[in-house]
């Protein structure tokens, strides 16, 4: 995986949906597509397109578990990029944590919901 360039990172994070995905994953560690759709109030196809772009850039990793696909931030993100993400998270920490609290009580992995989008 080639290292992400600064211009590429800022282009990726300039989109509100992609930034939201990255910040939620920074807060919660790992989430499935349906949880991200719920948290961001976006459709599954739109969320999946953004997840694909983030995965292709090397920022995210995914793993399949049955019919669910779970995403997390890659541990191989360059340190400078991780600092950018951390600063973005700090600037929106209260909002991200509020969304995370709501999601934690309703997510498919946290509540044992049998149906995932």
From Swiss-Prot:
Q: One GO molecular function term? A: DNA binding
The GO biological-process annotations, alphabetized, read as: response to arsenic-containing substance
Could you tell me which residue ranges the HTH arsR-type domain spans?
1-92
Superkingdom is Bacteria
Q: What are the DNA-binding region positions?
A: 33-52
Which Gene3D superfamilies does the protein's record reference? Winged helix-like DNA-binding domain superfamily/Winged helix DNA-binding domain (1.10.10.10)
**Does this entry carry the keyword Disulfide bond?**
no
Q: Supply the alphabetized keyword list.
A: Arsenical resistance, DNA-binding, Plasmid, Repressor, Transcription, Transcription regulation
S-S bridge residues = none
Q: Which Pfam families match?
A: HTH_5
Q: Which PANTHER family match?
A: ARSENICAL RESISTANCE OPERON REPRESSOR (PTHR33154:SF18), TRANSCRIPTIONAL REGULATOR, ARSR FAMILY (PTHR33154)
Q: Which proteins does it associate with, and in what oligomeric form?
A: Binds DNA as a homodimer.
What's the stated role of this polypeptide? Answer: Transcriptional repressor for the ars operon. ArsR is a trans-acting regulatory protein which controls its own expression. The repressive effect of ArsR is alleviated by oxyions of +III oxidation state of arsenic, antimony, and bismuth, as well as arsenate (As(V)).
| Record's protein name | Arsenical resistance operon repressor
Source organism per UniProt: Escherichia coli
């Amino acid at each position: 995986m080639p290292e992400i360039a600064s211009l590429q990172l800022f282009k990726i994070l300039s989109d509100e949906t992609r930034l939201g995905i990255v910040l939620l994953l920074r807060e919660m560690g790992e989430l499935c597509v349906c949880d991200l759709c719920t948290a961001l109030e976006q459709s599954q196809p739109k969320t999946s397109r953004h997840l694909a772009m983030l995965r292709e850039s090397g920022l995210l990793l995914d793993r399949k578990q049955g019919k669910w696909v779970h995403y997390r931030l890659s541990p191989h993100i360059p340190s400078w990029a991780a600092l950018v993400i951390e600063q973005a998270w700090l600037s929106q920490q209260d909002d991200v944590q509020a969304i995370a609290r709501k999601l934690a009580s309703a997510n498919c992995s946290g509540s044992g919901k049998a149906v995932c989008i």
